[in-house]
A protein has these predicted regions:
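Peptidoglycan cell-wall recognition and remodeling modules
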Residues: 1-108
Length: 108
């Protein structure tokens, strides 16, 4: 969690995985790598690589996935919030997890 929080305000760059810029899966990959867990650099591949949990089971650090096909992932921080690298022109930020295109959640 601390690794993800330390990236707040850094720019979104498609294909980037830190340390100066990130895309969504690059951010989750970078944060979990700091905790000793390897993840692929693709939201869909991350979803397929980890154990799925229900939204009611979310704990800080869990991943939340969006889109069909899956194209976005964020890191749950608690209180219905996540840290995400959202899109070109934006920065790593806090956002609500509640979106109509939520697919599921997982725990690496």
């Amino acid at each position: 969690m601390n690794t993800a929080k330390a990236q707040l305000g850094k720019p979104y760059v498609y294909g980037a995985a830190g340390p100066d810029s990130f895309d969504c899966s690059g951010l989750t990959m970078y944060a979990w790598r700091a905790g000793g867990v390897g993840l692929p650099h693709s939201a869909e591949m991350q979803y397929n690589a980890i154990a799925h949990i229900s939204v009611s089971q979310l704990q800080p650090g869990d991943l939340i996935f969006y889109g069909t096909p899956i194209h976005h992932v964020g890191i749950y921080v608690g209180g219905g919030q996540m840290i995400e690298a959202p899109y070109t022109g934006a920065v790593v930020r806090y956002a609500s997890i509640y979106r109509s295109d939520m697919v599921g959640a997982g725990r690496p």
